[in-house]
Amino acid sequence: MSEYKETLNLLQTPFPMKGDLPRREPALVERWAAQRVYARMRAAAAGRPPFVLHDGPPYANGDIHIGHAVNKVLKDIVLKSRFAAGYDAQWIPGWDCHGMPIEHRIEQLHGRGLPPEAVQRLCREYAFEQTERQRRDFLRLGLLGDWPHAFRTMDFRTEANELRFLERIRARGLLYRGQKPVNWCVDCQSALAEAELEYARKTSVAIHAGLRVRDPVDFASRFRRRPVLDKPAMLVVWTTTPWTIPGNAAAGVRADAPYGLYDTPGALIVVAQPLADALFASLGVDHALCALARGRELVGLALGQPFFAGRDVPVVEAEFVTLDAGTGIVHLAPAHGAEDAELCRRLGIAGENVVDGAGRFAADLPEIGGLPLADGIARIVAKLRADGTLVREAAFEHAYPHCWRHKTPILFRSTPQWFIGMDIECEQGEADPGRADVTEEAGATGEARKVGKAEEAEEAGPVKTLRASARDAIADVPFYPPSARQRMEAMIDGRPDWCVSRQRTWGVPLPYFVRRDDRSLHPRSARLVEAVAARVERDGIAAWSRLRPAELGVDENAYEKLSDTLDVWFDSGSIHATVYRDAARADTGGYPADLYLEGADQHRGWFGASLMTGCAADGRAPFRAILTHGFVVDGAGRKMSKSLGNTVSPQRIADTRGADILRLWIASTDYAAEMSISDEILERVVETYRRMRNTLRFLLQNVADFDPRDDAVPAGQLLDVDRYALARCREFVDACRSAYARYDFLAVTRLAHGYCAEELGGFYLDALKDRLYASVADGVERRAAQTALHSVLANLLISIAPILSFTAEEAWTVFAGDERDSVFLHTWDEHAPPPDDAALARWAHVRALRPHVTKALEEARGAALIGRSSEAELVVRAPRDVLDALAPLHGELAAVFIVAGVTLETADQIAVAVARTPLARCERCWRHEPSVAAHASGDALCARCRHALSRRARAERSEPRAAVGSR
């Protein structure tokens, strides 16, 4: 065969076997930007159904990490696959730019004490640098999107829109000022949202403390059997926050629970009866039950405040008291606990902060004023011990909320803040996003009622709370995976009123003026907010910092402007209104978004914030579906941590293996669970990639001289195996489309790999090689095979392009012969072959027969009956119905099984017999053919090869055909 090698159709392709991705990929990133591929995609999709993906913006601080890469690549896969499916897929990337981390960084670099405008300017410059840095890294991953119009929450227009959007929520009566316990970080010097908390193990000082009975006679009368009070009596509470003891305002009991009075060596102690034995066992003291009373019978009893000797506190009914731990009696400090505060508010019991914003005890507290928390706790415990009310002190390890930025334990302390109420009723219905200004009637509390022509024209919607509206809004929203719904529902049910105010400088301001005496809002707040927004839109938030109330006609003697800024979760949670529904943007997509896609921690974060803002303003969710992905862990299942040294840099993967390897790992990992990554795992991904790349290379080689405009064979002239290959290609496309549509990217990678390795590499391409290599170059048999391969290659590239974006584009450039063309400009509908169920049914029998043939050939080879399969002749015995199905394909079976011949015989069961063929072998194609005869030169050639050589000789004598691209 070697002397005939040059006469075979062995084509070359510029698509190399080795990907060399780290070197090739950056050039494609530059090309996509220079050729405005995303903009051309949008132009090509004009008039198609829209598919809008909103971007949960990453924070503009530091390099991107592997979690960022997972999130953004998943979004990119969604975007590209929706375009391929025939949608006008839209994604505007963006960044979250305000907040404490950047402000803290500026303080580190420039010190504290700078004027607000200077802080804001430096923060803005720093945030911009960070976004540009992250932009480069994101683009390196192959992300397509509207990058020229990427948003930053610090954009002047976006900041102004946020003020207008907040006013819409306030105008519905959902924004209020209140004194409530909030999560407080002493390092941030600010309140924190629930989403800004991380739970970590903490060892606290836990104490059992007694609250002494003030009136023994009253106390004794509350028990069914009046006890003898020959010792001091006290109700015992248990707390892991002894620093709140000076703030104790009451003791809570469960109304229907039994409480026992127990005689112990030092005192008479009251605790819940079901918890008594465990408690006294832990104390190691003898005890005897003296009397019983229900919790409701103890309500109203006066007790001595444990820290302040002359102060009394009452026993109250508390519905949240449980009997699974502690003493069944709860220490209530309304300034330091949400449930405590709400209960005491209803009962008219006041509370006061005992710790300031810096984490020190209030200066006016005796003995502990001004002390740091740890020192003060030691003094409190010592005082209780000296007073005889310390029952027990012990270390207690538990999960405790920490600041997600500083990793330090937070405090619960009552501060005046602004809240969005979860349980305030308001009328539902989508608000007009363009109507920010309303007239109002404002009461002393500052809560406003909307009055206006637009409202009068609208039919009033149902009245619901924000919590109920949020529950209803997600009722029909699909979640991927479905289990994520429970997390969202739990977030809604357990979410307290949203504290949206922060005590920082770098943030969008609360744009309100309040009275100096009663803190009520200015009656013209709506108009004033619009005036402020106009200035912010021109000059940014610095306009608020330098604004004097008098400039807007506000009496500075009566009113002052707020100094609080908005929670950054409000910034990002409102982008559906401030960015995606901004009338100033030429094309912002539809509303609500078709998909929100973020990590599993975002149910409390961006998902929750977006849901609450959407329902607060419009009574609906800003998304139609939610996809949640898991966190990245190492190969041993451990969380990524710098201290463990197991972090994986997406930049390093892109620079050493290629971004397509990272993308393939992301797509081939079940994102619904934790996503494991390691060098070993990536190496397996590389092997999968190589097999797929080799398939692409084979396909490109064998259509290199094919131009469908001149060379395509009509469907009626295709061999039946080619029609079958196209039918299987359509099945592959349909399966990929379905998997992409349900966001099952793992299924797509399995389909693509299986299609390359089994359907193509393991069947069709093997069957084609002889026809491709040895047939007449422009003969109908070879062109028929190339017609099928051309369609297969186009559809395979479109199907893998959302995942293997760089490789698919590299291959498409060769395939199309035009660098201006892009695989991302094409859809399945343009290229997918029509369904052909009849071909599938015919060839199902061949595929079922193939394992029997393979086994028989292996046995014959093992018995040294044959060497190559082409030396074999097969006798296929099968039932009549199988033979009837195979009969029309009889002429193609030898080529499909790569044997010299196939004979069909009737039998009860399928069986395959192998014999060595007596036919001579063609020296050019190596097929054993009856037509093989000696050439004049003495060479043994089959009729087909003689014809091919003759055609080749005539072609060489004539003018050579001009080279054409493969399309």
From Swiss-Prot:
Zn(2+) binds at residues 922, 925, 942, 945. Binds 1 zinc ion per subunit. Its cofactor is Zn(2+). L-isoleucyl-5'-AMP binds at residue 598. Keywords: Aminoacyl-tRNA synthetase, ATP-binding, Cytoplasm, Ligase, Metal-binding, Nucleotide-binding, Protein biosynthesis, Zinc. GO terms for cellular component: cytosol. It is found in: Cytoplasm. GO terms for molecular function: aminoacyl-tRNA deacylase activity; ATP binding; isoleucine-tRNA ligase activity; tRNA binding; zinc ion binding. It comes from the Bacteria. IleRS has two distinct active sites: one for aminoacylation and one for editing. The misactivated valine is translocated from the active site to the editing site, which sterically excludes the correctly activated isoleucine. The single editing site contains two valyl binding pockets, one specific for each substrate (Val-AMP or Val-tRNA(Ile)). Catalyzes the attachment of isoleucine to tRNA(Ile). As IleRS can inadvertently accommodate and process structurally similar amino acids such as valine, to avoid such errors it has two additional distinct tRNA(Ile)-dependent editing activities. One activity is designated as 'pretransfer' editing and involves the hydrolysis of activated Val-AMP. The other activity is designated 'posttransfer' editing and involves deacylation of mischarged Val-tRNA(Ile). NCBIfam families: ileS. This is Isoleucine--tRNA ligase 2. The lineage of its organism: Bacteria, Pseudomonadati, Pseudomonadota, Betaproteobacteria, Burkholderiales. The gene is ileS2.
